[in-house]
Regions:
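Conserved ATP-binding/catalytic motifs of P-loop helicase motor domains
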Residues: 1-207
Length: 207
């Protein structure tokens, strides 16, 4: 997709900033990231588009919180979204930020005359967000993902999160797995499973 490729530009100058900022976030949140979690948060500072995948208990939520904190430090306006109301509610509870369904984000309505779904947010009226994080990407089909891409301004940072091994979306296309297999987009694989008591990160004494 040309619109996705247009978002892929990376800012190599952000590397040092990212390392320093990730260390700040660890101190502020009182945690020490596992190596791949740290890599993911740092990558978000410079990647136009990135994929974050991992199974249950691998620390995706902790990593997403770190990415949100990073974007906040960068002064970016952030939108959190998920394909279902349940997933959006869970995302909101775990990050402490409002999250909404992708359909609501795009202003989805049903056009009775055309007998098709229409979206308020498009190239002509794009989203204001400078960074968009989408969770449960394995549940997103081709049509919805294409609509989301059309609604993004050039230069918007896009973070796609999910479990590539999860059952694919009901609609057409296994978007998330296909993006990972393409090897065209920076991808971080979280494989280490943390104990629940660790809350998906290595908790340390912050004092």
């Amino acid at each position: 997709c040309a619109r996705l490729l247009a978002l892929l530009d990376m800012d190599a100058d952000q590397s040092r900033y990212a390392e320093r900022t990730v260390a700040e976030i660890e101190r502020e949140q009182g945690i020490t990231y596992a190596p791949m979690q740290r890599q993911a948060v740092a990558l978000a500072a410079k990647a136009g588009v990135m994929l974050l995948t991992g199974g249950p208990g691998t620390g995706k939520t902790t990593t997403v919180r770190g990415i949100v904190a990073l974007f906040q430090k960068m002064g970016l306006s952030i939108v959190l979204a998920a394909p279902t109301g349940r997933a959006a509610k869970r995302m909101s509870e775990l990050t402490g930020m409002e999250a909404q369904t992708i359909h609501r984000l795009l202003g989805t309505t049903w056009n009775e005359t055309a007998h098709q779904v229409t979206f308020q947010k498009t190239e002509k009226e794009p989203l204001e967000a400078e960074a968009v994080i989408v969770d449960e990407m394995s549940m997103v089909d081709v049509a919805l993902f294409s609509a989301l891409l059309r609604a993004l301004r050039p230069g918007t940072r896009l973070v796609l999160v999910g479990d590539a091994d999860q059952l694919p979306s009901v609609g057409a296309g296994n978007v998330f797995s296909d993006l990972i297999r393409s090897r065209k987009i920076e991808t971080v694989f979280l494989r280490e499973v943390f104990r629940q008591a660790e809350r998906s990160a290595i908790i340390r004494n912050a004092h």
